[in-house]
């Protein structure tokens, strides 16, 4: 127990880095995923093909490979072209996590949009709204509510996936645990503490998304008022 208490400040500092990485990745991933998800429904087949190729690539290859590809691969490519280019660990980590997350969020967005009844599109069209206005004012607000549970799952998955950026030396929670074990050699105690912190983070944010889902559900609000 003494070893865990002594290591706790370093592990908590790593946990903060983990949360920051996750928040940035889900933010950029949501922006990219929304664009990709709507593009997947485009009437233009080249757009659909390009977005599907992106999604299949990032969903079909290991995240660890993608991290190495971005952090080591791109600088090597630029060097072969005679250009001096290096990636900051933070930038590479956020980019890899964001690009990967965008591929999964794209399918969440696509599913959310397609879950809206076709009659609502037709009703909006009869009111004089164009496709963009219909998407913005009618479809997306409803689809977003339905996306909250899978987005919550993606967020908790990302928290765990951040541990992979330890391979490029980014000192998030898992990397802090590794460095601590390298100094005190108490692998069982430290990695147990690391696992429990990950669990606590996931439980906390899972509960937050559950609350958000209830808040965004009009039927739940009506029930509360009725009670």
Show where each model-derived region lies.
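Transmembrane alpha-helices and adjacent helix-loop boundaries
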Residues: 1-227
């Amino acid at each position: 127990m003494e070893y865990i208490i002594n290591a706790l400040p370093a592990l908590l500092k790593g946990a903060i880095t983990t949360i920051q990485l996750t928040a940035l990745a889900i933010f950029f991933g949501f922006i990219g995923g929304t664009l990709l998800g709507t593009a997947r429904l485009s009437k233009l087949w080249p757009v659909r093909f390009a977005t599907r190729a992106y999604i299949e690539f990032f969903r079909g290859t290991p995240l660890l490979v993608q991290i190495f590809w971005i952090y080591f691969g791109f600088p090597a490519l630029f060097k072969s072209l005679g250009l001096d280019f290096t990636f900051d660990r933070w930038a590479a980590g956020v980019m890899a996590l964001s690009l990967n997350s965008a591929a999964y969020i794209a399918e969440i967005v696509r599913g959310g949009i397609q879950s809206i009844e076709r009659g609502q599109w037709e009703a909006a069209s009869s009111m004089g709204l164009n496709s963009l206005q219909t998407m913005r004012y009618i479809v997306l607000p409803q689809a977003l509510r339905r996306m909250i549970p899978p987005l919550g799952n993606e967020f908790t998955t990302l928290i765990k996936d951040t541990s992979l950026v330890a391979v490029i030396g980014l000192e998030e929670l898992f990397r802090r645990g590794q460095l601590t074990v390298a100094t005190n050699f108490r692998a069982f105690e430290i990695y147990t503490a690391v696992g429990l912190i990950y669990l606590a983070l996931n439980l906390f944010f899972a509960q937050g998304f559950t609350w958000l889902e209830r808040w965004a559900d009009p039927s739940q609000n009506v029930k509360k008022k009725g009670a």
